[in-house]
Amino acid sequence: MTQSQQLRKLAAQSATAFLVAALCAFPLYIDKFSNLGVVKFTAVCTLCWAFALWLGALRAVGAVPQPGRLPWRQDTALWALGAVTISGVVSTALSLSPEASFWGLGGYYGGCMMVLFTAAGYLAVRAFAPQSLLNGLTFGVGVTTAIVTVLYVLNIFNIDLIGTYADTAVVERAQFFSTLGQKNFCSGFMAFALPLVFYAFLVARGVRHTVLYGIPAFFGGLALAVVDAEGLALGIGAAVLVLLCQRMFTTRTLRRLAVIGGFFFFHAGWMQYMRTHVYTQGGKPMLAALGHVGQTGFLVCLALWAVLRFALRGREVPLYRLGRCVAGIVVVGAVVLTVLANCWPSFPSLGRLDDVLIFNDDWGTYRGTAWRITAASWLDQPLWRKLLGVGPGMMHTAVANWAGADITDRMKTFYAAHNEYLELLLTTGVVGLAAWLWFVAAHLRKAAQNWLRPGVAPVTLALVSYLAHAVISIRVSMIFPEIMLLFALLQVFCLPPEEAAVQEKPARHAKKQKAAAPAEQPGLVRQWLPPITAGIAMMAACGAASRVIFDFLF
């Protein structure tokens, strides 16, 4: 093995450790609630820069990425990344408060610095992450999901095992759970984590893998039943609709979906019982309303699983045509009902669905108010600010300037638009929003062209879920770095298998040689123990170092 190959192998191991630290360890990193936002931001900022600089140093001394990893001239995704970065820098330089926009002080630390370090992390992962890490990384995300969910449930019932909220009033804790803090941040994590966890269970073969990925899926069903956020329901629903349209959707997939449905209805029924018999602080998730029919739903899922398991006797029947019809009916039906509910005054009430379909200032826990004032603030800006924005994190300031003396107490509570795309329009302008949509479209187009390659489907579903979730949520430092790393992983998985790509073609008239014996693959423990250990250690070290490096932010 040449020195360049050794350096490339070290870089691949480092990129794996980086992904473990960011996707599995970082969601569990926490400090006191009063500093939760800055603690999470400074820790992940230090982590991303540390790994990006380390991988950059390896590249400088000879660790050359595989061919096709960073094709600057042909790849529109890289140009889109440059556009996103430049638009963020320009909008920060022209911001209402450049210093606040650089650090994101006015908007959950989602400022220019986050754009810069996530771009660096994206390039580092895309350059060196190995294609063979999906199964282990997915299992790690599943373990993290289970831990986050359990802590979330315990905090709902006022049980704080790790003392995180010891200094926080009980009334405040009603809105803050687990290690990610506020419930909407938890829903953002679950929006991309649950599709990875559920997909691994859907495609698992054999008893060992089914049980291995079934345990995180069981806790994923619990997360769906307890995480109090409409965005999670929207994100998971969008991912399911995309899954139904794929050729891989068969009776076997439906059977596994029935098992996941059984997990969900079991937990929803249990939570309904607990809410009626035990005091809880948490709100009531939209999906938890199905707890009223928890027993019926569980039995229906069990019956569906039994029919598909025993009646078909192991045969797999394609269902993607039916799935596409169902997805089309759901989308068209939702659009028609929304239009009728909002535009036809005499349209009959649909009960609780009215809270979802009818848009007004009270929609989605006053998200309607946030959307209205954000749009009005953008329309009130001069043309050049419409194009370039008021600066990252400046939504609250822009709204205050627009409303003036007419600002209400409700308006004062919003530091984000609760719609990532609408907030980008205000803070980075038409240019910034267009750059981000270009970046997203370039990646999803590449995913559609390479859907059948290993790893593409689960990562795409995770990103689709997050992008749908972002319609009614906010971009924060707790979640966005992981999303950028998933975009980078998607590009890695879309490439042809690199083992086949590096095989040398034999000469035209050369004598045929016997194929070399395949290299012995290391065991799972030997393969994953070093990156897991390194990832956890780096997360701990970067978390501690961030308190010193970014002391001025605390």
Language model regions located:
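Membrane-interfacial, low-structure loops and terminal tails that flank and connect transmembrane helices
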Residues: 1-9, 62-74, 283, 311-323, ...
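Membrane-interface coil-to-helix junctions
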Residues: 76-79, 182, 374, 417-419
